[in-house]
């Protein structure tokens, strides 16, 4: 397992492993890295939805997103963030589901609207664009630590 730090405040990249065939010790190392660095990138993993789901379940119970329009018809735990439907057809930008998807372009935290927010998200980029499509991450622990004490007291 090769671990490379991505930024001083957040993120590591892990190479040299196969997510579809993880032993318990390797998974525990991954979980520890996730808790410490908050974001993990696993480059060049060609995984199925089933492997994606099984990997996620190792972290805990999976959430089923309330939006039916982007939920996988075969695997409800998979929420499709795409302008392409499950049949490979481009979703017209006038469709309600496309408009809903467009809202995710704004800064947000996944599932923060829920009574009990999720612990994290697993994003599997199957086909990504060279322009746009950015996904950003922030270390809110670090943001809080960097606040002046008077602001922390207000919060």
Task: Kindly give the residue locations of the regions a language model identified.
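Non-heme Fe(II) oxygenase catalytic core, chiefly the N-lobe of the double-stranded beta-helix
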Residues: 1-155
């Amino acid at each position: 397992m090769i671990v490379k730090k991505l930024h001083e405040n957040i993120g590591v990249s892990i190479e040299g492993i196969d997510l579809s065939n993880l032993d318990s010790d390797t998974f525990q190392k991954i979980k520890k890295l996730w808790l410490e660095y908050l974001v993990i990138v696993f480059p060049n993993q060609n995984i199925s939805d089933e492997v994606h789901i099984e990997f996620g379940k190792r972290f805990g119970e999976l959430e089923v997103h309330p939006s039916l329009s982007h939920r996988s018809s075969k695997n409800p735990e998979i929420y499709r963030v795409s302008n392409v439907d499950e049949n490979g057809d481009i979703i017209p930008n006038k469709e309600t589901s496309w408009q809903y998807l467009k809202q995710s372009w704004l800064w947000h935290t996944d599932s923060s609207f829920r009574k009990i927010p999720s612990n994290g998200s697993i994003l599997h980029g199957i086909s990504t664009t060279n322009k746009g499509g950015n996904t950003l991450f922030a270390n809110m622990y670090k943001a809080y630590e960097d606040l002046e004490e008077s602001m922390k007291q207000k919060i």
